[in-house]
Design a protein with these regions (language model features):
Chain B
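Structural signal for membrane-spanning alpha-helices in multi-pass inner-membrane proteins
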Residues: 16, 20, 41, 60, ...
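Hydrophobic transmembrane alpha-helices
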Residues: 1-43, 47-58, 68
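Membrane-embedded alpha-helical segments of multi-pass membrane proteins
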Residues: 31-39, 73-78, 160
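Membrane-embedded alpha-helical hairpins and interfacial helices in multi-pass inner-membrane proteins
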Residues: 25-27, 31, 66-70, 91-185
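Residue-level recognition of pore/gate-forming positions within transmembrane alpha-helices
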Residues: 13-17, 57, 76-80, 102, ...
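Alpha-helical transmembrane segments and their immediate interhelical/interface regions
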Residues: 57-96
Length: 252, 185
């Protein structure tokens, strides 16, 4: 959908945890608020984040693509088919409480999608790995996040090759739903069994690279994490905790 | 966690993410986004399967850009624990024992997903479920009930097929390969 977009903004140069913390704060605050105005302020905050990183053009298209179908369904489910009282809006009669609820739910989704797409656009995966390694994060979590993303395209290619090979052998992937269900087995079985057979080989390859040594690794060029950014992240935690405390005590 | 478990967990995550591609090519009304979680639960154990489920949920969000679905991660934990228990009682030995076990998981997972879908997303979630919800609401059903019915019915079908699929995979494992997974052997 969207990956890292090279740039020189403050968030591009920041420690990778900082843009991720900003996006996580938008997510948690969006769920803490339950009226349209503060939720749409979160959308504005996410848009400002994308603008500040210079990735607004890359972020806005995918964000609209992801959020628009949900917004339309929310409008139908809560606006058109919502509870009375209803008010005329052009040729339609829309539920007033339904529209308010759709605005809250739609705003949350918009804010979360924009904030995380902006964070993904500014966080270089390599810098994130260096940042995690420098913080002493064990090999396991780093391996799972990074290696899986590296392996995924290869497995997708293999799935496409198996599909072509089975079709060449006469497998029909069209027809009735039952026929398509039957086609699932000859496609999934070779893919999974082939991958399971390679597990030992991959374990051996990782062992020879010292993955099990248990020694803390040292990145060559770890990203700097100035005190200001650490304070900012701590501040975000405080804001989220205060917002949720206010929400749980019905003060917002 | 052992290195071998890590490699199997990675495999489980990849299966979760790639089978969706096969399902889309076949135009099936399913997600099948937990086959890897169920398989790892049967082959390795509950903690590995929970890790597969949660990492899949995060990576799915990273790849699609839609992080608003992260709260559904709790469903992956339920799937992992249930699949491990099902494996312990031998539910995967035959497809016809796996199918009813999958059906029950569908009811549990769908019932758990429905309140999340209703309260956090107002019923507007993913493709097939969303279409069923809208259709039921259009014929006058209350939204909360429409979300519950659509969520449970789609999950029952999805998890039944996923359990049968994992049963077929485990039955097709060559003995040499099976012996390398003590939890399954």
């Amino acid at each position: 959908m969207i990956g890292y977009v090279a740039g020189r903004s403050w968030l591009h140069r920041a420690h990778p945890y900082t843009p991720l913390a900003l996006a996580a704060a938008v997510l948690l605050l969006s769920f803490a608020f339950h009226t349209p105005v503060p939720v749409w302020l979160m959308v504005a905050a996410a848009l400002i984040m994308a603008l500040a990183t210079g990735t607004i053009r890359e972020v806005l298209g995918p964000a609209l693509l992801l959020a628009t179908p949900t917004w339309l369904v929310l409008l139908v489910l809560h606006g058109l088919l919502g509870e009375p009282p209803k008010a005329p809006f052009g040729p339609f009669l829309l539920s007033e409480p339904g529209v308010a609820r759709a605005l809250v739910l739609g705003g949350r989704i918009g804010a979360i999608v924009i904030a995380f797409l902006a964070a993904l656009a500014t966080v270089s995966p390599a810098r994130l790995v260096d940042g995690m390694t420098a913080r002493g994060i064990p090999f396991g979590p780093i391996f799972l996040l990074v290696s899986t993303l590296t392996f995924l395209p290869r497995t997708r290619e293999r799935a496409a090759r198996i599909l072509e090979a089975q079709q060449a052998r006469g497998l029909r992937i069209g027809g009735s739903p039952l026929a398509r269900f039957r086609a699932l087995v000859p496609l999934v079985l070779p893919l999974v069994l082939g991958a399971l057979a390679e597990v030992d080989e991959q374990v051996l390859a990782l062992e020879t690279r010292g993955a099990t040594s248990g020694v803390r690794r040292t990145p060559l060029d770890p990203p700097a994490d100035p005190a200001g950014q650490r304070v900012l992240r701590l501040g975000l935690v405080v804001v989220v905790v205060v917002a949720w405390a206010a929400r749980l005590t019905n003060r917002i | 966690m052992k290195l071998r478990d890590l490699v199997v967990i990675r495999l489980g995550v990849i299966i979760n993410l790639v089978i969706g591609q096969v399902v889309a090519a076949l135009l099936l009304p399913l997600f099948l986004d937990a086959v890897g979680t169920i398989l790892v639960a049967a082959l390795v154990g509950p903690w590995a399967a929970i890790t597969v489920g949660l990492v899949s949920q995060v990576l799915n969000a990273v790849l699609s850009g839609n992080f608003s679905w992260l709260p559904f991660g709790v469903i992956q934990v339920i799937i992992a624990l249930y699949a491990w228990l099902a494996a312990r009682v031998g539910a995967f030995r035959r497809p016809w024992t796996a199918a009813p076990a999958g059906l029950v998981l569908g009811v549990i997972a769908g019932s758990t997903a429905a309140p999340i879908a209703y309260h956090l997303f107002g019923g507007a979630t993913a493709g097939g479920v969303m279409a069923v919800t809208t259709a039921l609401r259009a014929v006058g059903m209350p939204l909360e009930l429409a979300v519950r019915i659509s969520s449970v019915s789609t999950d029952m079908l999805d998890k039944t097929v996923a359990f049968v699929m994992v049963s077929l995979i485990l039955r097709a494992l060559p003995n040499q390969l099976r012996a390398r997974f003590p939890a399954h052997a």
